[in-house]
Amino acid sequence: MWHVGKVFALRDETATARTFTLEVGDWPGHVAGQHVDVRLTAPDGYSAVRSYSIASAARSEGRVEITVERLPSGEVSPYLTQELAVGDRLELRGPIGGWFVWRTHQTEPIQLIAGGSGIVPLMAMIRSRASAGSAAPFRLLYSVREPAAVFYRDELQALTNNDEGVSLTYAYTRVAPKDWPRRPGRIDAALITNAAWPSNLGPTCYVCGPTSFVESAAAFLIASGQSPDKIRTERFGPTGDRK
């Protein structure tokens, strides 16, 4: 079913990513980790549809937050990140998805691993945990190119500072802050072993990002002893489409 959302607020996350909040009057509610299809239609009738993860907590009362990273060759993301304005209307379909989700009744340790914009659905999980008052312990391993590429920086910092049940580890692949304890580079088996929950605690692991990132991270998790049936993945293709 297609819904119409009105843009309520906009903010830049990075130089190439923007978050927008939509007011959707007939929104049925969603679960953290789900996504929506967004449809843009040109005056000549041509339409383009892209899928984007929902960033807002499950208890969002008719407001849906989406964060989009601009792709230079994209059809939809340049408009959403550069031209969309408060008061504009967007068509969206959803919520979609039932596997890559976190539900508030889950009490086991949760391991989140994000690559770049793959943080978006994981942020919905973190926010849903907070809004529900859940005591489930969360760990987030967030891989980004450089500090300037971090989404939700201030909110993540505040959450990890004020909630002992949420911990955050950054992995910078190109440029790290001065005196950072780890050289820039991709995540590897050692980092996964050090940052993730021990397998004997039975964590559920959620991994989201580009296809190659997700495949590597999932392989490292399995090699470290994590149960394959406790690893849930969401992949983005070369164009940013979900798989």
Question: Where are the language model's segments positioned?
Answer:
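Reductase modules of NAD(P)H-dependent flavoproteins
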Residues: 1, 137-243
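Ferredoxin-reductase
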Residues: 1-88, 144-146, 172-175
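Short, conserved phosphate/pyrophosphate- and ester-handling motifs at nucleotide-, phospho-/glycolipid
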Residues: 33, 118, 210
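Ligand-binding loop in jelly-roll beta-barrel domains
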Residues: 58-64, 104-108, 134
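A short, basic/flexible loop-to-alpha-helix module at the beginning of a structural domain
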Residues: 94-107
